[in-house]
């Protein structure tokens, strides 16, 4: 797929799909699965359309900025998964939502990331916190994503050659790193990746620029205009355009009243991004 980078200003549980040209009844309850990341036993939610498959699959990387291990983007993390899954399944995609170490159903496998970072800031200051966040993102947190992708491809219901990765906020950063690591991914979609960190962390900027340089999958950057900052989407998309690599950028009008509202557009205004995301995924996973 060849897309020029463009700039555009541009839940109800659905039971029948319309995006694939045929009806697929959406299962309400997920399957809970377990996979290994090193010595850890991590959990994941899994949904798929009815039928034997194999289906194209989307792995979703949740954020890590909630007040505790059970929340993301201001809502329970399990509810976040349940809010998104029907949208992907109705378009014909299996949806895999791994809980990384220390969070959600994997909270018993490690300390919650924010607790670790807050302790680091209290002992050594904000710069030390940012550096530790970067280190953990590029090591153990990324390890969990890579392990989840490997596990997902072993499932008999999945077409292992048609897998995409998506993510929100911190999970959006991991999505870019996964796209760099895994040359077999067919598409990557980030929602509000690095919106709070891009301008204050030179090492993060350098690392994500390197990631998009090396990634082979088409990348879609999504943000609302009132996110904390949209510089990351603008800068990364501009770099991909310079390199003549396939990408797309969507910066939508403001959502809600605050930067946090804009940051969490993935959960608060699904109809705003749904058409763009599935057009992009459909093109990427059928090329």
For every predicted segment, state its role.
Residues 21-53:
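N-terminal cap/lid segment of alpha/beta-hydrolase-fold proteins
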Residues 53-55, 64-107, 197-198, 229-230:
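Short substrate-entry loop that stabilizes the transition state in hydrolases
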Residues 56, 61-63, 223-224:
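The conserved beta1-alpha1 loop
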Residues 61, 98-100, 191, 252:
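Alpha/beta-hydrolase
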Residues 109, 113-156:
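Alpha/beta-hydrolase active-site loop
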Residues 137-214:
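Primarily recognizes the serine-hydrolase "nucleophile elbow" in alpha/beta-hydrolase
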Residues 187, 193-248:
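The feature captures the conserved acid-bearing segment of alpha/beta-hydrolase catalytic domains
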Residues 246-287:
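C-terminal catalytic histidine-bearing segment of alpha/beta-hydrolase fold enzymes
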